[in-house]
Structures are given as structure tokens and as C-alpha cells.
Amino acid sequence: MKIYIASSEKHVGKIQEDVYMRDAYRNKGFSCEIVILKNIIKISKPFDVVILKSIWGYHLHYREFLKQVLMLRKKNIKLINDYDFIFWNIDKYKYLYELKHMNVTPTTLLSLKNTKKASEIKNIILQINKTLNTNTLVIKPCISESGYLTFKYDKTKDNKAIIALLQQNKQLDFIAQPYRPDIVTGELSVVIINGIPLYGIKRFPGIFSEKLDPTYIRFISLPGAIKKEIDILKIFLLKKFGVFPNICRVDFLKLNVGYEILEVELIDPDLFFRYIPDVMREKATSMIYKSFVI
């Protein structure tokens, strides 16, 4: 068995988290390499392991990405996370809709394919403003990451530039969510390995606020409201898939006195290894390792 850490051409061998995982598994006696995904398809053999990591940018060519994933499955490659999790997690609107029984940021589908004029796009968005009872929306593609085509749309301001970009990309499906002012205080993320919540991360992605370094938070120190949502999510995942994902990150946003789930990351979640204690990094890596040697 060989372990491949899947990366992209731009990032292969350059991401600290990838390098740490590679070295950790080499130290356990495994053959482990960081390789771009399209090359892994060519060289991997049945029962090898592929961990999706710095494949950032897959959303730009997601159909090709899904074809590559299917080719891995056809070759009987062990994928982290497993195939069904990847297919479920790729479309934000679809998976968030399935989680609507939880405290998820209200999410509406924004389809612009049939529009011809900027005024039509504006009217559709204004209707969503009304439906969600908010002046300000966050708009982003259903399949996206890292702030790609993500806009803050305030109906009281001039939005010509945003509407123009939406019009240029109207072939994409978008989601619209109410903008939460508390985003400026950062997001709280929880990293879960094999169904066990390990630690939290206070993060400032820099999309609608200043970009700052993330900070580590012990899981025991996280708010009870977040722990409750994690428990409900675990029940859902176990019921739907029969197993927990090997690697999961759940991003929360503060709302008044509680918290909302903003996203659930299962495809290539950043685990923020560079910001957590060595002992926790070693624990997380070992737990991931156990998921593919059993």
C-alpha cells in the first residue's frame, strides 16, 4: 500500500500541512508522496490510499475533478474522505438543504441562467432580500471555495459591478445567505477526525473582514451551542452514510447569542496543523492513519 497526498500543480510540495502528513506517514514506515491528482490516477494501484489535501481550485473544473474521483474508485483506491462524502459535499446548496433541521445559515438558491438583462438579476436578488428579511446578502457559487466569486450585496448601495460579474457567470448556480455582521469577529471552526471532535480554530479568512492568523482553541473550551450542533451533525452523518467521514471541518458563525453552521468541509479541509500544538497535530495524524490501515 502506498499513500498519496493529492495536491495541485501550483501547490505540490509547498504546503506545510501536506509535508507534515507525508513525513509523519513516512516515519511510520509507509511509502508516501505528494502528487498532483491527475498523476495519481496514472500511477496508483488497487488498495493504495489517496488523501485529498491541497487540491485548491478544483471548483473551477469540478466536472473534471469528479471524473478523476470516479476513476480512482474504479481502480479500487481508498479515498480520504470516502467517495460518497465527496459527491455529497460538492454542492453547498444541496447539502445545506439536507441540514436545514439544524442551525444552518438560511440559504436560498440563486439561479440566473434564464436572465438576459441586469435588471432581471437585480429583481431576483431583491426578492431574495425580501424572502430572507435582510438588506444585505452574501452571494457565492454553489460549487466554490476560498472566496471565489463571493460578494457582499447591500441592496441600499450601488451594485452594478457585482451584477455585471454575476451576469458574466450566470451559467453557474449561486446561493444567497443573509450577511451576518459578526463575521468581523471571525468564524469558529471545529475539526473532527473519525467522528471525534478534536479542537477548534478561531479563523479570519479575510473575505469580509481583516485577514488574521487563526488561533487554536481546545474543544472543551468551545461554546455549548457549537458542541450541541456537532452532536446533531454526527447523528445525521452516521444515519445517512453509515460511517463518519475520516476528516471533517465545520465552520460556525456567531448569531446573537447562538451560532449557525456556515459550511461543512469534507473534500479538502484545511486542518490548520501549523497553528495547533504538536501533541494535537500528532494525535490528528495518527487518527487519520488508523482510518486507512484498519
PLM region spans:
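Active-site nucleotide/adenylate-binding loops and adjacent lid/helix of ATP-dependent enzymes
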Residues: Y4-S7, R73-K75, D84-T185, K227-D231
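Phosphate-binding site of ATP-dependent enzymes
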Residues: Y148-F236, L253, E260
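Conserved N-proximal alpha/beta basic substrate-recognition cap immediately N-terminal to
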Residues: E9-L112, K116
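Nucleotide donor/acceptor-binding cores
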Residues: M1-K2, D48
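Short, solvent-exposed loop/turn segments at secondary-structure boundaries
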Residues: Q16, F151-Y153, Y275-P277
